[in-house]
């Protein structure tokens, strides 16, 4: 992705981390593996954070574009 992705990279990475975390958490529960469950929860938190960063970058870009139009 380019430097002009306006948060898309973070959103994609965030979604991947959230899905990966969900899978780890479910597998951890099924196998009674507390460590894997914790890793899954952590991955979901990281994914949410990355997604938020992506959203902020997108909003900043939109704001800058709006200011250019004026």
UniProtKB/Swiss-Prot annotation:
> According to its UniProt record, what is one Pfam family this protein matches?
CsbD
Q: Which InterPro entries does the record cross-reference, listed alphabetically?
A: CsbD, UPF0337_stress_rsp, YjbJ_sf
Q: Which domain of life is it from?
A: Bacteria
Protein family (similarity comment): Belongs to the UPF0337 (CsbD) family.
Q: What is this protein called?
A: UPF0337 protein BC_3635
Source species, please? Bacillus cereus (strain ATCC 14579 / DSM 31 / CCUG 7414 / JCM 2152 / NBRC 15305 / NCIMB 9373 / NCTC 2599 / NRRL B-3711)
